[in-house]
């Protein structure tokens, strides 16, 4: 999806002033927002790619001006409403209540040991996205490939700065959930995944550092084989 969410390769945004002692969480609510991801995942709100797509539904100005974990809250709300698991009017009513009564106790709820176990597993071990497929990969290490110029309207992992650029396959990872379908509610549809090396001069032109490269993970439909013999003729 094109938008402010795809800022890779963009300049002119100023320096990144990162404090030397920056904490993992800057506020208590951010800890809750972090823990909510595996919990909402388990509850059927969304998958990982849908999680990202929900963030892409934010107003661009709000996205740029808000803290990182607020993006997470926004996608929980988006998918909670979409799936019928959150009633927006009730959410707004409860939010207003706690704004007016910040010291009021939170609603009681039943502890679910299996959910806590799942959250711990997801946080410390991750949620694997690799899948088995019965078709061989189209590309191998050393192949010269070109990244598609397609401009998707839904969720995808096709950064604008690599579209139309030529690179070299350096690794095949097996098959993984395909974000272009999974992120748009169309199923996992796993595709082979590759790491492709793009030189800085291929990406940025003659002014690019001749000793630098970017390694970009590409799903199979993103790339096509370049006929190097024909190109050299």
UniProtKB/Swiss-Prot annotation:
Role, per record: NHase catalyzes the hydration of various nitrile compounds to the corresponding amides.
Comment on activity versus temperature: Optimum temperature is 60 degrees Celsius.
Assembly and binders: Heterotetramer of two alpha and two beta chains.
Superkingdom of this protein's organism: Bacteria
Record family assignment: Belongs to the nitrile hydratase subunit beta family.
Keywords assigned: Lyase
Lineage per the UniProt record: Bacteria, Bacillati, Actinomycetota, Actinomycetes, Pseudonocardiales
Record note on biotechnological use: Industrial production of acrylamide is now being developed using some of these enzymes.
Substrates-to-products reaction catalysed: an aliphatic primary amide = an aliphatic nitrile + H2O
GO MF annotation: an example: nitrile hydratase activity
Protein's name according to its UniProt entry: Cobalt-containing nitrile hydratase subunit beta
SUPFAM superfamilies, sorted: Electron transport accessory proteins
